[in-house]
């Protein structure tokens, strides 16, 4: 089911795929701080044209924990890309040297192009402002590990839901489960119409809100993304909106006792640091799950 597959869009995976991935990730948790030889002799090429900390490092650690090796680059500096080499030619070279390619790029569609060119499987580690499928898989895996299920939960997405690529992929993944999603953002920062139309066509229950205080008592999960300052022409408008989409201790006064707060990280100031010490804060555990989740992904794709 997974062997040899590309991971380009969250839309390409169904519930059976995800449940198989989650079970394998849970199995891989016991190896996340050790080394096994499941992928001994395999080489992963990383092509990160954009900055990354958690995604890049967790992929590299995952491959090394599985006994494989890593080659590649982080930024175009010092590569033939600086000389004008095309993306397609760069991918062809990496394909010749490796068994799987992990790519991050600022342009939407870059991962799809890479998959069309390469014979080896390609994993999209984020392209443009739209796709980040492995982050969405990690997010939903964290929910699954915390609650033992995803079905039946009320999930709130808070912040800039238009420009955060994690949001698009997360919504697409969630269409495989029986959940209700609360979209909490300024109207101008709601997800793209195309995304909304797709997830509604898949039967996902949606509601739109502009105030977290009005709905947080109903939520089982709050998934926070930052309000992106660079999207605002008027800095005063940014300051006004930013403060309305922040999680503080006061925000958490009347929440469910088993509420969890997630964030793809890095954060700026959208979650008060005092929230870190509450039982609701699960974003660091979420980040830690990145290694076993990506170990599972690599193993399932490259398994003998």
Curated annotation (Swiss-Prot):
Carbamoyl phosphate binds at residues 54-55, 104, 132, 135, 265-266. It comes from the Archaea. PROSITE patterns: CARBAMOYLTRANSFERASE. It is an enzyme of class 2 (transferase). L-aspartate binds at residues 83, 165, 226. Pfam families: OTCace (PF00185), OTCace_N (PF02729). Its EC number is 2.1.3.2. GO terms for molecular function: amino acid binding; aspartate carbamoyltransferase activity. InterPro entries: Asp/Orn_carbamoyltranf_P-bd, Asp/Orn_carbamoylTrfase, Asp/Orn_carbamoylTrfase_sf, Asp_carbamoyltransf, Asp_carbamoyltransf_Asp/Orn-bd. GO terms for biological process: 'de novo' pyrimidine nucleobase biosynthetic process; 'de novo' UMP biosynthetic process; amino acid metabolic process. It catalyses: carbamoyl phosphate + L-aspartate = N-carbamoyl-L-aspartate + phosphate + H(+). Keywords: Pyrimidine biosynthesis, Transferase. Disulfide bonds: none annotated. Pathway: Pyrimidine metabolism; UMP biosynthesis via de novo pathway; (S)-dihydroorotate from bicarbonate: step 2/3. Heterooligomer of catalytic and regulatory chains. Belongs to the aspartate/ornithine carbamoyltransferase superfamily. ATCase family. Catalyzes the condensation of carbamoyl phosphate and aspartate to form carbamoyl aspartate and inorganic phosphate, the committed step in the de novo pyrimidine nucleotide biosynthesis pathway. This is Aspartate carbamoyltransferase catalytic subunit. It comes from Pyrobaculum islandicum (strain DSM 4184 / JCM 9189 / GEO3).
């Amino acid at each position: 089911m997974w062997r040899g597959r590309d991971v380009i869009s969250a839309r390409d995976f169904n519930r059976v795929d995800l449940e198989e991935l989650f079970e394998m990730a849970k199995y891989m948790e016991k190896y996340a701080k050790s080394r096994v030889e499941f992928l001994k002799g395999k080489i992963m090429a990383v092509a990160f044209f954009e900055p990354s900390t958690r995604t890049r490092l967790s992929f590299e650690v995952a491959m090394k924990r599985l006994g494989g090796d890593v080659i590649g680059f982080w930024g175009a500096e010092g590569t033939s890309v600086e000389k004008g080499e095309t993306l397609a030619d760069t991918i062809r070279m990496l394909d010749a040297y490796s068994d799987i390619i992990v790519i991050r790029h600022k342009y939407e569609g870059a991962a799809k192009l890479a998959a069309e060119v390469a014979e080896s499987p390609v994993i999209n580690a984020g392209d443009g402002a739209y796709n980040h499928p492995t982050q969405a898989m990690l997010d939903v895996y964290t929910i699954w590990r915390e609650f033992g299920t995803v079905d039946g939960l009320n999930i709130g997405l808070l912040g800039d839901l238009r420009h955060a690529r994690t949001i698009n992929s997360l919504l697409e993944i969630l269409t495989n489960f029986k959940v209700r999603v609360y979209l909490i953002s300024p109207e101008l920062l709601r997800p793209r119409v195309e995304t909304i139309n797709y997830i509604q066509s898949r039967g996902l229950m949606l509601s739109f809100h502009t105030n977290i205080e009005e709905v947080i008592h109903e939520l089982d999960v709050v998934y926070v993304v930052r309000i992106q300052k660079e999207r605002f022409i008027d800095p005063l408008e940014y300051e006004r909106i930013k403060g309305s989409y922040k999680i503080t201790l006061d925000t958490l006064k009347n929440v469910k006792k088993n509420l969890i707060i997630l964030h793809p990280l890095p954060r700026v100031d959208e979650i008060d640091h005092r929230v870190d010490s509450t039982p609701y804060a699960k974003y660091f555990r979420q980040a830690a799950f990145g290694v076993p989740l990506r170990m599972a992904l690599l193993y399932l794709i490259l398994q003998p």
